[in-house]
From Swiss-Prot:
Pfam families listed in its UniProt record: ATP-synt
Membrane disposition: Peripheral membrane protein
Protein name listed in UniProt: ATP synthase gamma chain
Keyword Signal belongs to the record: no
Source organism (scientific name): Acidithiobacillus ferridurans
Keywords: ATP synthesis, Cell inner membrane, Cell membrane, CF(1), Hydrogen ion transport, Ion transport, Membrane, Transport
Domain of life: Bacteria
Gene Ontology biological process terms, A to Z: proton motive force-driven plasma membrane ATP synthesis
Role: Produces ATP from ADP in the presence of a proton gradient across the membrane. The gamma chain is believed to be important in regulating ATPase activity and the flow of protons through the CF(0) complex.
């Protein structure tokens, strides 16, 4: 058993660590609330773009945008969203596990994969494992802007439009609640064609376009893909802060339990030391009495 001095040093160290994890927990909670507000603010824009795009596609079925063309899959693209920093539980692990699993399934079918990565954690992992990276971006911070992440988006969209990849998957985390974040693999390209019933088509109305509808559809399709990825990045940021808050709370709770255990061990060590000192004093006193009695005999 360690002596009382060593245990006292361990208690001090764990208490200092707990102060740090508590501070990180509170910071993550504050950032999580702001990230959730950004996520909710971005959602109506993406939904409105999707609504207008669906209306345009149904009103002009004769025009098939290159990003909506379905082809036999010979090569796949992945746009992977991860974090720049760690200490967020298994958030990145779950995302990257999904990427590896999907790539393995495609490889068994003879399909190769290209990857574009958002976030330093995913970039480092995929580089170490020899993945074919075509674009990456990191250092987006806590308030990412669409312009900062446009590189990977354009790389995947252009590759699909040119026929260099035949399908693009978006891999990220979806925010369910503060305690639960779910890693997902969703098809980003080709964009699914909207469907309408006969009654809906009969009631379909149209906008007036100047000079024509095709440039509007082209531009809107590009904005739609960008909005989907931006929404995924914002949502992943909310997941990151939630996971970090939960991880730091767990670390703080574990530190408290460790301090309690160390305090108990310290009390036992101190009690043992005091008991030993009392025993030594008693033994010394008894020895002194024996010597004194022996002395007075003479």
């Amino acid at each position: 058993m360690a002596n009382a001095k060593e245990i006292r040093g361990q208690i001090k160290s764990v208490k200092n660590t707990r102060k740090i994890t508590r501070a990180m927990e509170m910071v993550a909670a504050s950032k999580m609330r702001r990230a959730q507000e950004r996520m909710r603010a971005a959602r109506p824009c993406a939904e409105k773009i999707r609504e207008v795009l669906g209306h345009l596609a149904q009103a002009h079925p004769e025009y098939e945008h290159p990003l909506m063309q379905v082809r036999p899959v010979k090569k796949a693209g992945f746009l992977v969203v991860t974090t720049d920093r760690g200490l967020c539980g298994g958030l990145n692990v779950n995302v990257l596990r999904n990427v590896v699993q999907k790539m393995r399934e495609l490889h068994e079918e003879g399909v190769e994969s290209n990857l574009a990565v958002v976030g330093n954690k995913g970039l480092g992992f995929l580089r170490r494992h020899g993945a074919h990276l075509v674009a990456d971006v990191n250092g987006l911070g806590d308030s990412p802007h669409l312009g900062d992440m446009i590189g990977p988006i354009r790389a995947m969209a252009d590759a699909y439009a040119k026929g260099e990849v035949d399908v693009v998957y978006l891999v990220s985390s979806r925010f369910v609640n503060t305690m639960l974040q779910r890693a997902t693999v969703e098809q980003l390209l080709p964009v699914e064609k909207p469907t309408a019933s006969a009654e809906q088509r009969a009631e379909l109305w149209d906008y007036i376009y100047e000079p024509e509808a095709r440039p509007v559809l082209d531009r809107l399709m590009q904005r739609y893909v960008e909005s989907v990825v931006y929404q995924a990045v914002i949502e992943h940021l909310a997941c990151e802060q939630s996971a970090r808050m939960v991880a730091m709370k767990s670390a703080s709770d574990n530190a408290k339990r460790m301090v309690d255990d160390l305090q108990l061990a310290y009390n036992k060590a101190r009690q043992a030391a005091i008991t030993q000192e009392i025993a030594e004093i008693s033994a010394g006193a008894a020895r002194f009495d024996d010597c004194a009695q022996h002395f007075w005999k003479f």
